[in-house]
Design a protein with these regions (language model features):
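Exposed aromatic-hydrophobic patches
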Residues: 115-117
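Active-site catalytic loop in hydrolytic enzyme cores
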Residues: 1-48, 63-65, 69
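CN hydrolase (nitrilase-like) catalytic-core segments centered on the catalytic cysteine
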Residues: 39-113
Length: 117
């Protein structure tokens, strides 16, 4: 995690390596952006070429539209799948979902289970 948000400095140490790596598993290139890292386009450039970008988060409910827009834009800009997870905590956006490279979205909203048909 490169950026600490809110009170996270009480529990986490900022990462030392400012470069985001893309790993390959069975021919699939996978990258990880943790929560607030989603907001930095210089990090998007570092993961260009990834097939899948995972975004685990604890995204505040007041910024729900930001989370939705950023994950969708990341998928379109990098032509990749974005798998975004967020907490079901009442203070969070509850917008876990999968965005395809065309920007088409399947999200769980306030449901407890995300099902892909």
């Amino acid at each position: 995690k490169l950026f600490r948000f809110g009170g996270e400095h009480n529990h986490f140490i900022e990462g030392e390596d400012k470069e985001v790596k893309v790993i390959e598993v069975d021919g699939i290139k996978i990258a990880l952006l943790i929560c607030f890292e989603l907001r930095f386009k210089n990090l998007w450039a570092q993961i260009e070429g990834a097939d899948i970008v995972a975004v685990p988060s604890w995204w505040g409910g007041l910024r729900t539209e930001h989370f939705k827009s950023l994950t969708q834009t990341l998928a379109i800009m990098n032509q990749c799948y974005v798998i975004a997870s967020d907490s079901l905590n009442d203070d969070c956006s509850k917008m876990s979902g999968i965005v395809n490279p065309k920007g088409e979205v399947t999200r769980n909203g306030d449901r407890e289970l995300l099902e892909i048909p």
